[in-house]
Design a protein with these regions (language model features):
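Short amphipathic alpha-helical segments
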Residues: 73-77
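Long beta-strand-rich cores associated with HINT superfamily self-processing modules
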Residues: 68, 81-173
């Protein structure tokens, strides 16, 4: 697929990530302004790279015409909390919002992955306004603590990015 076509596909997702980052960072600002405890420590967002999208489509055998329906994490936002109890609070805040709807939830806190990965994932439907009109798309929101984020970053690198020979005792974890 040509570069210009990829840009046009990913542009609304970039907008969604920027908007979601602003909205969740606003919660932090609002808590500070009102001198109340904030369950959100940090917000980060990203749009999946073209190579990562293609790799996922190949791995899951997703045809190009189904990409936007089946690759749910083209847009991603990670919300970092200080404490595990904050995760439920943040999920509840998101569930109550009128500007996004929850499509699905995956609770890797109750159902820890074999690798030790722990996090709370929401797939949301979110609408952005583009020059061509409104576009409803999907985004993944990951909610986790700083400690969980540290482990998840290492686990992700070992699973998807690391190209060397992994020691057997590390692969088993």
């Amino acid at each position: 697929m040509e570069i210009q076509l990829w840009r046009s596909i990913l542009c609304p997702y970039e907008l969604a990530v920027r908007e979601l980052e602003v909205k969740f960072n606003h919660i932090i600002d609002e808590c500070k302004e009102n001198d109340i405890y904030c369950p959100i420590e940090q917000v980060e967002g990203r749009v999946k790279s073209v190579s990562s999208i293609l790799e996922k489509m190949q791995r899951k055998q997703i045809p190009m015409e189904r990409m936007e329906e089946e690759v749910e994490d083209i847009a991603g936002v990670r919300i970092i909390c200080q404490f595990e109890e904050d995760i439920e609070t943040v999920a509840s805040l998101i569930q109550k919002r009128s500007d996004m709807t929850i499509k699905s939830e995956k609770n890797y806190l109750k159902h820890i992955k074999q690798s030790g990965y722990r996090s709370y994932h929401l797939i949301i439907h979110y609408t952005v306004d583009t020059v061509k009109g409104p576009k409803k798309l999907q985004a993944e929101i990951q909610i986790r603590t700083m400690a969980m984020n540290f482990w998840a970053t290492i686990e992700h690198s070992l699973q998807y990015k690391y190209k060397g020979d992994m020691p057997e005792h590390v692969a088993e974890r």
